[in-house]
Amino acid sequence: MTLTFQTKAQGPKVAYLFPGQGAQAVGMGKELYDNSAAAREVFDKVDESLGRSLTKVLFEGPEDDLRQTINAQPGIMAVSLACVKAMEENLDLDEMPQPIVMAGHSLGEYTALAVSGVLDVADTTKLVQMRGQLMQDACDQNPGTMAAILGLDQMALEEVARETGVWVSNINTAEQIVISGDRMGIAQAMDLAAARGAKKVIALRVGGAFHSGLMEPARAGLVEAIESMDFHNPTVPIVANCTGDPLNTADSIKEELVAQVSGCVQWKQSVDYMMGTGVDSFIEIGPGRALGGMVKRINRRAVIANVADLESIMKLRRN
């Protein structure tokens, strides 16, 4: 199963955004499954590719099961892909917002692979599942955690990270940066960041130190998984998490996916790049509204829309 779309010549310059882990909620995608044949086909293909009923966990929970990486990651991806297919099913060509670029936050970068034709839905699902397991194995080998630091200059926080042996793992906005590392290092970094003027420090409820050097054990297995699959050049450029630059070839995307598992997510840089190329409208596709909120804090001129169900798709038609 491959996701495809036509393009139109005029209208606003649109970027698609795809959320990452943390956006999950029990019941997500159920309304799409019940009311859209195209969306239901995505969910069924994901279940078939995994060899188990992920949809049961998505629609019924319990929340603790959905929060597990092996369920949350393919689940968020499935809902985002189902949203795209439901958009195509319900909107005419002149109503369908066509992206000139795409970006996904961490896991969301994998969703972009399927939407831009780099991989089909089945292979994307399998790769996300393998990535999730490799990350979990790395977490078991190198236990750690993450914290959000609000209101501290990036250079100052990078110095805190160096002094405490942790990593800057997500630069979401100028005011919201996430750090990752072992539990002792993160506790020390939170105290030091607060002492140096951070407005707020928040311990995150996560299963590991994602996007840090503690994820290095996942790289070898991820390389092997990626090389076993048939990658294609994207039909729409994907902005890389690690560099904020556009990816236009299969080889560059493979390199990015390997680097991303232990590298910093440069979300602010990615948004700055997209707006610099003329993007004025962002559509966050999938559960949650975190990415749109970040984009708005990065640049208030940005127009934000969210697609998570049929009602939000119909709003695109009216707008």
Where do the protein language model's features map onto the residues?
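Short hydrophobic/charged patches on amphipathic alpha-helices used for structural packing
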Residues: 268-272
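FabD-like malonyl-/acyl-CoA
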Residues: 2-156, 281-314
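Non-catalytic positions within long, well-ordered alpha-helices that form the structural scaffold/packing
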Residues: 194, 275-278
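Short glycine-rich catalytic loops that host catalytic nucleophiles or stabilize transition states
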Residues: 203-206, 275, 308
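Alpha/beta catalytic cores of group-transfer enzymes, especially the acyltransferase/condensing modules
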Residues: 21-23, 50, 115-264
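Short amphipathic alpha-helix with an adjacent loop that forms part of the alpha/beta core around
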Residues: 315-319
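Conserved functional loop/turn residues at catalytic and ligand-binding sites
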Residues: 106, 230, 278
